[in-house]
Amino acid sequence: MLTITAIKAFNDNYIWVLQQTPHSQVYVVDPGDAKVVIAYLVSHQLALAGILLTHHHQDHTGGVGELKRYVEQTSSQTLQVYGPQKENIAHVNVPLNPEMRTELTLPFLNAQIQVLNVPGHTAGHIAYVIEDALFCGDTLFSAGCGRLFEGTAEQMLSSLTLLAKLPANTRVFCAHEYTLSNLKFALTVEPNNLNLQAYMQKATEMRAQNSATIPSSIALERAINPFLRVGEQSIIDSIKQHFDDPDPIKLDELTCFTRLRQWKDIF
């Protein structure tokens, strides 16, 4: 059975630990901080088998070098570090190009891992699907999506459309606890969305108890995430009103997404 555990890092990052019982070897996703990972490994008597990276940003990769040295010192083995080939990340020794290779089989994880090409937040951003779990870094957040630092709106919309087509029961393990702030924006865009209203209440209660709102699910995101709903008339009308656009012609999805992202950037 695959167990997935969150290690909290910095202000709002989640580093995900993947363990297939009964193995004591684990993988971690996007370890921006080595110290919290090492503390977790030691306290749970686990060995680090590998690292999965989604993109190059420091809060996702900053701990890789120290973790690699830790494994070399404690086991005399070379740590396997998987990451996007396009981003030339330090310490990655298994570069992945999902346009050429879309599946992985990792030691100690009894499951095929699907590698997805999801540019937008960064130029080479990738995501991993393991059983019913999606590890999407900073591409898809609960009720939101990542900023466009390197990619285009067209790329990000394509990436989000790809993720939205995953099975509804897919659990969404993004890398940040941004849910409440994203929900505030989503309700500004779509105030009459009953699913949004209900989830805002639930998420607020969860955070008040210091509980994580992650994982989300693809089904939930289809219902509440404005960036997955840019074809909905309620979203289109809200964008037109916000940007003072009286044109009766229906906006296409790319234009809606572009304007929605611009709106969120200054929200």
Curated annotation (Swiss-Prot):
The gene is gloB. Zn(2+) 2 binds at residues 59-60, 138, 176. It comes from Shewanella sp. (strain W3-18-1). Thiolesterase that catalyzes the hydrolysis of S-D-lactoyl-glutathione to form glutathione and D-lactic acid. One of its GO terms (biological process) is methylglyoxal catabolic process to D-lactate via S-lactoyl-glutathione. HAMAP family: Glyoxalase_2. GO terms for molecular function: hydroxyacylglutathione hydrolase activity; metal ion binding. Keywords: Hydrolase, Metal-binding, Zinc. InterPro entries: Clx_II_MBL, Glyoxalase_II_hydrolase, HAGH_C, Hydroxyacylglutathione_Hdrlase, Metallo-B-lactamas, RibonucZ/Hydroxyglut_hydro. Zn(2+) 1 binds at residues 55, 57, 121, 138. Its EC number is 3.1.2.6. This is Hydroxyacylglutathione hydrolase.
